[in-house]
Amino acid sequence: FHFDCFWMKEFHWSDFVWDERVFPDPEGMLKRIKAKGLNICVWINSYIGQESVLFAEGVEKGYFVKRTNGDVWQWDMWQPGMALVDFTNPDACKWFQSKLEVLLDMGVDCFKTDFGERIPTEDIMYFDGSDPKKMHNYYTYLYNKCVYELLERKRGKGEAVLFARSATAGGQKFPVHWGGDCWSDYELSLIHISEPTR
């Protein structure tokens, strides 16, 4: 059973906190769903909005991608002032995993790792000094790897699964992937079927 983005409050993506207005008892709800034999997936992404309780913590600890002047890189695409977790920083990855681990302990089984493909390439720097242009594709690998390693640690080898929207070479190590957000017509369906084999 999949919960898409609005399991969290609007403008709080991603804080990994259930919206109590809609889900006043998330643990009880998850237990009821699991009692019916269903596994649970929740939507996440690697952007942390200014309204998220995690934003200040991530800024203070240096867990976000930065501009070359040292400021946190921010973007206003879906919500104001989103920062991007820097998965080249091992501590940032552990921090991100620690937030997801709370959800796994609550009863969530997997994560839909959305986005990861709209990565800046100009005027930014990564913790490990990676080339921003090369990171444009590699970022999604690191994002999915970070989440998958947590799932494997918590659920066991052969039991971990994520639901990834974007991937690059090597992404097949972190199953499964979906080719979503496309039109449902014959021509695009053919492209959609052939693209993964390239």
Predicted ranges, named:
Residues 1-194, 198:
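Catalytic-domain carbohydrate-binding cleft regions of carbohydrate-active enzymes
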